[in-house]
């Protein structure tokens, strides 16, 4: 799973996920399913934000990479991926500037057009169950919730999906592709139900005895097929800016 994550996701996404896990004392090399889940969630947050701007009239517009957008303001502020101290600093700044209510939990994004924080969810289960879990945890009508699944389903607060259909379809397609790539490598079942996978692995190890004449070393080389996986497609200009901003914050 670790090799898959490093080949499948943008290097900046992988780096931010590693830093987030280490901040909580978790090891990406051991908790590989969580590593994959965090990378997926980060990618969805970035894709949610990509190419969405606010023009001088305060209207939301979509500008593709390469178009002049120096005078445009990004519609979404990305909070997810920052260390906790910096993330709360950003949240406090937004609240002081806009007057919105401060959330009890760190949200993932802030929407400058709708003036609300957004909690993004990516689930391997049914969307309505995960939505209710998020809502019960947050317990705030001020934070907008938007849940995506790997099967193409989604659910949002008051059925307000924020983004246009094409932007949401791009996210759904990416999630479905991740699922298909995992399944083709036999990783999907353990990703969906990691506890059962661990129990089955322990059971298999107890039943198996070492066989004479069989190789005992495991190859860690990346297969040629895995090397062909393209990383996440992202606005290259914003990727560079985000990398500089996020990593600068991490060093402080």
UniProtKB/Swiss-Prot annotation:
Keyword Chloroplast carried by entry: no
Keywords: Decay of host mRNAs by virus, Eukaryotic host gene expression shutoff by virus, Host cytoplasm, Host gene expression shutoff by virus, Host mRNA suppression by virus, Host nucleus, Host-virus interaction
Places the protein is found: Host cytoplasm; Host nucleus
Gene3D superfamilies named among the record's database cross-references: Influenza RNA-dependent RNA polymerase subunit PA, endonuclease domain
Chain coiled-coil ranges: none
Feature type site, description Important for efficient shutoff activity: 202-203, 206
GO biological process: viral RNA genome replication; viral translational frameshifting
Domain of life of the organism encoding this protein: Viruses
Entry keyword annotation includes Transport: no
Residues with site note (Important for efficient shutoff activity and nuclear localization): 195, 198-199
One term of GO molecular function: RNA binding
Record: active site: 80, 108
Matching InterPro entries: PA/PA-X, PA/PA-X_sf
Record function comment: Plays a major role in the shutoff of the host protein expression by cleaving mRNAs probably via an endonuclease activity. This host shutoff allows the virus to escape from the host antiviral response. Hijacks host RNA splicing machinery to selectively target host RNAs containing introns for destruction. This may explain the preferential degradation of RNAs that have undergone co- or post-transcriptional processing.
Domain notes: The probable endonuclease active site in the N-terminus and the basic amino acid cluster in the C-terminus are important for the shutoff activity. The C-terminus acts as a nuclear localization signal. The C-terminus is recruited to host protein complexes involved in nuclear Pol II RNA processing.
Family that this chain belongs to: Belongs to the influenza viruses PA-X family.
Name of the protein described by the UniProt record: Protein PA-X
């Amino acid at each position: 799973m670790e090799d898959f994550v490093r080949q499948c996701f943008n290097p900046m996404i992988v780096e931010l996920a590693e830093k987030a896990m280490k901040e909580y004392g978790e090891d990406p090399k051991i908790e590989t399913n969580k590593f994959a889940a965090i990378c997926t969630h980060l990618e969805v947050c970035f894709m949610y934000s990509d190419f969405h701007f606010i023009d001088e009239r305060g209207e939301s517009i979509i500008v593709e990479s390469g178009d002049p957008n120096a005078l445009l303001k990004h519609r979404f502020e990305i909070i997810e991926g920052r260390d906790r101290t910096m993330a709360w600093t950003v949240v406090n700044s937004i609240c002081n500037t806009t007057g919105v209510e401060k959330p009890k939990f760190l949200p993932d994004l802030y929407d400058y057009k709708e003036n609300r924080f957004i909690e993004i969810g990516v689930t391997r289960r049914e969307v309505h169950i995960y939505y209710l879990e998020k809502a019960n945890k947050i317990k705030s009508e001020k934070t907008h919730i938007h849940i995506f699944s790997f099967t193409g389903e989604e659910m949002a607060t008051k059925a307000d999906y924020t983004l246009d259909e094409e932007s949401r379809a791009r996210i759904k397609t990416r999630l479905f592709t991740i699922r298909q790539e995992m399944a083709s490598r036999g990783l999907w079942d353990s990703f969906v139900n990691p506890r059962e996978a661990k129990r089955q692995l322990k059971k298999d190890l107890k039943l198996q005895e070492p066989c004479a004449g069989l190789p005992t070393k495991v190859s860690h080389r990346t297969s040629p097929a895995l090397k062909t996986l393209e990383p996440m497609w992202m606005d290259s200009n914003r990727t560079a800016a985000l990398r500089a901003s996020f990593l600068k914050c991490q060093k402080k």
